[in-house]
């Protein structure tokens, strides 16, 4: 995305106007045209409150509109003046102010509001709640099993030490017992090295269990206050077209609009959060999964995701969040034909926009209805795989 100059800038465009008479006389009335080529409404930033352990996010808005290129075109006509024939070539004389070009895009005049498509907005809110559920599952499982994990770690570590001590003393039967292997096992070699290699089949699983238990305990070692974060960004290409009255012209705009939602939350009830992540607290989701061929509906209209989002906040407390809307795009303005003139090349202007607005959200977002694009290749392959899986069950 091109970076625009954040301050205003004036530019100059040369408008040709030359009349050539039949007797060879030239009359040049060309002139420069000054226009505002860059405009920015300025930056808006607010400072979020700060506590001992948390700095709340702040709102801000930035944007700029720039006229990338202005071509006055080429027009020609034949005529007479006081009985003298002439051929005249001229430019359109199009004058554009970057401040008025906001109307070419789905934004407000001061660029602090972006018209995000409803489908994008609903998908972002629904899927970010799904991210919250995934976070609940990962941390909820860890918290719920932390106590048993600690006990398991100590038991396995003691078993490892005892097995190691027995092996060093040559008491292989006792070592096998600690490693939960068959103590009546007969070795093919009497050498200590061969016996040790055969015991690897018992050592390795035990060491793996100890490492896994240790990692789980270190991951769930939480501070008194530790917010988690869920993020989802969704974008869509948008095309617009319309008419202008001054100058008399048509325009076509293409832009990309995206919404990024960030939620900071913390789990205040690990058991409820875990149950919510498993879908146990949402009977509607369970019933929907049992509906025959519901996955075909989910392919286009993800009802399952929307139902899942209804119970995502259970067991969690909302801390803060932001909604960031971004637009970047380009518009082409094409002037209408001029009456009485032949259009050799129409006058055109290319306008670019780049704007971002972030607002602070103080409550949980709510799910909404959205439609997935059925033309995505990955989406289509996923649906075919699901269809085959369900059909051959």
UniProtKB/Swiss-Prot annotation:
**Record GO biological process:** viral genome circularization; virion attachment to host cell pilus
Give the region (Viral RNA-binding) as residue ranges: 26-233
Q: Which GO terms describe its molecular function?
A: RNA binding
What name goes with this protein? Maturation protein A
The subcellular location is: Virion
Q: Which family does it belong to?
A: Belongs to the Leviviricetes maturation protein family.
- Keyword Cell inner membrane in record: no
Superkingdom of the organism of origin: Viruses
Pfam families given for it?
Answer: Phage_mat-A (PF03863)
* Gene encoding the protein: A
Q: Could you list this entry's UniProt keywords, alphabetically sorted.
A: Host-virus interaction, RNA-binding, Viral attachment to host cell, Viral attachment to host cell pilus, Viral genome circularization, Viral penetration into host cytoplasm, Virion, Virus entry into host cell
Quaternary structure (record): Interacts with the host pilus.
* One of the record's GO cellular component terms: virion component
Summarize the protein's role. The maturation protein is required for the typical attachment of the phage to the side of the bacterial F-pili. Binds to sequences located toward each end of the genome, hence circularizing it. The RNA genome-maturation protein A complex is released from the capsid upon host receptor binding. Maturation protein A enters the cell along with the viral RNA.
């Amino acid at each position: 995305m091109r970076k625009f100059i954040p301050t205003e800038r004036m530019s100059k465009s040369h408008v040709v106007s030359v009349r050539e008479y039949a007797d060879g006389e030239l009359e040049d009335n060309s002139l420069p045209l000054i226009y505002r080529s860059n405009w920015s409404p300025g930056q808006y930033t607010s400072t979020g409150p700060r506590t001992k352990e948390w700095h709340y996010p702040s709102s801000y808005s930035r944007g700029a509109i720039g006229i990338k290129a202005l071509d006055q075109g080429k027009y020609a006509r034949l005529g007479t003046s006081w009985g003298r024939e002439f051929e005249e070539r001229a430019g359109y004389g199009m004058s554009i102010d970057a401040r008025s070009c906001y109307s070419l895009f789905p934004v407000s005049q001061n660029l602090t509001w972006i018209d995000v498509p409803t489908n994008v907005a609903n998908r972002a809110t629904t899927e970010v709640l799904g991210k919250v559920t995934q976070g609940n599952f990962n941390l909820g499982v860890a918290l719920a099993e932390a106590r048993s994990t600690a006990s398991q770690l100590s038991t396995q570590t003691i078993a490892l030490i005892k097995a190691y001590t027995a092996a060093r003393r040559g008491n292989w039967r006792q070592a096998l017992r600690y490693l939960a292997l068959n103590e009546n096992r007969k070795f093919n070699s009497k050498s200590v090295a061969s016996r040790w290699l055969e015991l690897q089949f018992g050592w390795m699983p035990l060491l793996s269990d100890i490492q896994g238990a240790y990692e789980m305990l270190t991951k769930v070692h939480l501070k008194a206050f530790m917010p988690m974060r869920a993020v989802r960004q969704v974008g869509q290409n948008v095309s617009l077209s319309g008419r202008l009255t001054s100058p008399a012209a048509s325009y076509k705009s293409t832009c990309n609009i995206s919404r990024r939602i960030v939620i900071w939350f913390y789990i205040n009830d690990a058991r409820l959060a875990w149950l919510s992540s498993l879908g146990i607290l949402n009977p509607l989701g369970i019933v929907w999964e049992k509906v025959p061929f519901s996955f075909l509906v989910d392919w286009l209209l993800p009802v399952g995701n929307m139902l899942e989002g209804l119970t995502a906040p259970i067991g969690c407390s909302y801390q803060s969040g932001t909604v960031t809307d971004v637009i970047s795009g380009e518009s082409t303005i094409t002037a209408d034909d001029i009456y009485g003139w032949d259009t050799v090349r129409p006058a055109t202007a290319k306008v670019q926009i780049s704007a971002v607005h972030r607002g602070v959200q103080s409550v949980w977002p709510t799910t909404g209805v959205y439609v997935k694009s059925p033309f995505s290749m990955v989406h289509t392959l996923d649906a075919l795989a699901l269809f085959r899986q369900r059909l051959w069950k």
